[in-house]
Amino acid sequence: THILINKANIVKTFLNKLETSKILLSMKIKTPQTIELNKFNEEIDYPIIIKSKFSIYGKDLYIVKNRQQLENIKNTLKNYEHYIVQEYIGTIEDEYTTTVYKDKSSLEVITFKRKLTGGMTSFAEIRDEKILKNYAKIIATKLDLYGSINIQSRKVGNDFYIFEINPRFSSTIYIRNNFNFHDLIWWINSFNKEKLCKIDYSNKVEKSGYAILGYKYKFFKGDDNENR
């Protein structure tokens, strides 16, 4: 029996946003400046983000515009030594999600520029961003990834800043699967010669396309813009 979970060092690092920042900096990968809240002395210009070191799905996240807001929020937090301050970078219109899958014989990367509505991805377009692809390969290789992780970033000018990495299957797994990025199936099949989940391995990951969420997702492969 196999449980699809990443290695302990990967889970431990990426569930902690402060440790995520440290390891990205050690790899010379751009990431927003990040400081523990109880050590913050306004080293970062406002606006700033306050969030839990361990939060998921955007919970316990506050955008703070000035010192008064900072003090007000600190007064409402319990155990605020468990919180971090992070530089606010870019805009929500320039947010990207990248998934990297790696096993003993393969390494695959896919990136979407996405729009969020109510915490869900309402629009996702495949983008060939070489910087993000390179970052994903560096992270996967240096941490000896065996499985799948999800990387969140924002574009500022010509640069990308990674602000979060999720060491689990992300909510875009269904979208990825429709563009031949079958990280769940690849991971399952990597443990057995019989390839329990049948897919056509000759189908390459799509290089272009987009998904739109209405009542359900609609998928468009290629560069056709007529249906946008």
Feature-to-residue mapping (PLM):
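Conserved metal-phosphate-binding beta-hairpin within the catalytic cores
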Residues: 143-175
